[in-house]
Amino acid sequence: MGLTYNEYCTKRRQYQEMGRDMLLQKKHACLFYEPGKGKTYPVIDALRTIDAEKNGNAKVLIISSADAIKQMWKVDIVPQNILPKNTYLVTDRTAIGDISETLLAQKWDVIVVDECHIVKANTSKIHKLVYKLCRYAEYAFGMTGTPRGNSDVDIWCQLQALHVGGQGKFSWSAWTRIYCDFETGYGAYGKFQTPTTIKEKWLPWWNNLLDEYCMFVDYDEDDEMPPLDIDIVKIPYKKTKEYENAYKGIIEVGEYATTTEKMVAISKAHQVCNGYIYLPDKVVHRFHDNSKLAYLDKYVDQDRCVIVYKHIADYEDLCRKFGNKATNKVDEFKTGRYRVLLLQCGNCKSFNLQDCCNTIVFYTLDYSFIKYKQMIHRCWRLGQKRPTKIVVLEHNDTVEQQIWLAVQTKQSIHNMYMSIKRTN
């Protein structure tokens, strides 16, 4: 565990007090603090204030990912006995299952959506459920360090789901039609349009909405973050016939294909250059051993480390290599009995590894910037004394270069966006 709540109460930063006060004043609002900047305790501060006003009877629902609830809420928060007594924790996947009707039948005073970027897709089941839950809740709080994926529409979808600033009254189609510029694409079923940016004439309104109902907190020079060393290890790769065919598939998809079609084509080439491919029946066909495996010993021999992978086929290779030196369970890794923590790139939310290791190796990298950013902040956090080392293993002159470039580009846009919001 990092900072306890009692310690936090004596060390609150001004932005944390301001965040708590904004939540209480606006009632439906979001904290968009960078990972590690401390957004959970301001939310708990607000919950405790609301609970006191309701004579200890506030009904609170906290929705988060399974990883966050298992690795953070139940480990670091619940044992401190600081949540209102009528607090219920539920995973996003459980919430959209059989208990959804039970949740909707309950009158909640407060809905908290942790890692609220989980509702940025307006067509997802969790977005629709959160929208219904927050519609009648007196308070609805969202928090995430990665609110923006590809565009501001991602942020708006979160505001809509939580009914922040009156955005719940809009449908997605009506809002985008009024406020957004569109990009035209062509797919198998003809022409389609995708909202990309806020129309220039509406930017002042949009910025005012965010300023009033959302608090963005970026890293600053006073944080004393440890140095972050990113090492791109380019591994020689002899292109095989299978890779050439897979790469050709990307080109043949065409400029106007849907995003899904493009991602499928890229994913096939990515798999093949790592020695395997998933066939339509989900059977893995292997072409050759992944040459990246030989590069991992250097980092494991130096110190304990996290190895991030994308597909189960990668996990199987890593398990064969490291055997009982590795685990995929965070709590087991924290005991110190294992040299290696194997994490699938989607399982990277909310837990703290800064006292366990300071090296993260991306064995196979997902193109998602949000997953990348969430992962590096498991180790690179406030209060850490040791430099953090990020290693990206990349087969040279393959699609992996483009995947890393896409992540870097989104990182630059995110950094610029957060710095602009902080200074306004």
Question: Positions of the model-derived regions?
Answer:
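Conserved helix-turn-beta segment of the N-terminal RecA-like "Helicase ATP-binding" lobe
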Residues: 67-87, 162-165
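Conserved RecA-like P-loop NTPase helicase motor core
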Residues: 120, 315, 323-403, 410
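Conserved helix/coil segment N-terminal to the catalytic DExD/H
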Residues: 92-107
